[in-house]
Amino acid sequence: MVEKVTRKTFKIRPSGRSTDFIAPSFGFGCLYNCSYCYMKRHKPEGLSVATNTMDILTEINSHVWFADVEKPNQTGEYITYDISCNEDFALHAKYHDWETIFKFFRDHPLAMGSFATKHVNYDLLEFNPEGKIRIRFSLMPEKWRKILEPNTSTVDERLRAIPNFLNAGYEVHLNFSPVIVHDDWLTEYKLLFDVINRCSHYYNWSQESVKAEVIFLTHNKDKHERNLHDKLMGEEILWKPEIQEPKISQYGGSNIRYRSSNKLEYIKQFTELHDAIIPWNTIRYIF
C-alpha cells in the first residue's frame, strides 16, 4: 500500500559516513521485504510518500548554505545529502517527483544527492544529473541475496547496470551492506570480488570513480522474532548471539551487533581480501 502524506517536520540530521547529512524523508517505508531491514522494524507494511517535495528541497537549500563542513572530505567534493535513508528511492521513484529532486541537486552549486538501492531502475537513465547524484548499489553474495533480499534486482543485474549509470552522468559507488559473518563468508566474498573485478574490466568502468562503503550487520530482536513468526529463511545467519553482543539503538531498540572484540578482526579480514582482488575500489569507510 502506498499512501500520500504531507511532511510536517524537516529535520536534517548529520551523517558523516555515507553522506554529510540525512535529508528529511521523501518517503518512509519499503515495498521490498528484506530480512534484515531496519525500516521494517518501524513500518512493517507499505510506503508513505511526501507530497510536499518542494518544501523538503527548500529546507535542504536553506541548510546547505550554512552547513559547517570542510570540503573536500571522504563524502565527496560537494555537501552530500542522503535522500533515501528510510526507503529504496530507485524502487519507489515512480511515486515521487524524482526529476524535480534530481534537477535540484544537479543545478545546485553546493549540494549533491545520494541514495543506496537494491533495484536497477532503468528509467533513471533518461536523466543526466551531471555527477550530482550518487547511486550506491548494495551488494552481497548472490546466494544470500536470493534469500535475504527477495524480489530485488540480482547482483549480476546491479553490476551490469553500473557502466550504464556512469555513462548517463551518475556517480556510482558500491555498498557492501550488510556484511554477514558465517562459516563461509570470506569464501563467498572472494567470489563476489572476483566477479566485480571481471565486470569492471569487461565493461571498462572508470575504476577510480567507483568507491565503496562497508557496513557489518546490525540485527534487531523484534525483527528477529517477526522473521521467525513469518518463517523467513536465513535467520540462522542473521541471529548468532554466540558472536554478537547487545546494543541499544539511538531510538531505544534492542539490537545486536558483532562483538567488538571480534569485529576488528572481521574488518581486517574483509579489507585484506577486498584490497587483494579489487584494490582500485577505494573503501571510503568500514564499520
Regions of interest found by a model, annotated:
Residues 56, 98, 158, 189, ...:
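Aromatic/hydrophobic pocket-lining residues that form the small-molecule binding cavity
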Residues 24-34:
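Cysteine-centered iron-sulfur cluster-binding motifs in ferredoxin-type domains/subunits
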Residues 3-22, 35-138, 164:
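Conserved Radical SAM active-site core
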Residues 78-82, 112-114, 132-136, 171-175, ...:
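Structural preference for beta-strand elements that scaffold enzyme active sites
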Residues 87-91, 120-123, 133-152, 178-183, ...:
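Conserved radical SAM core fold
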Residues 152-165:
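Glycine-rich S-adenosyl-L-methionine
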Residues 184-200:
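Catalytic cores of alpha/beta
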Residues 197-287:
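Auxiliary Fe-S-binding modules of radical SAM enzymes
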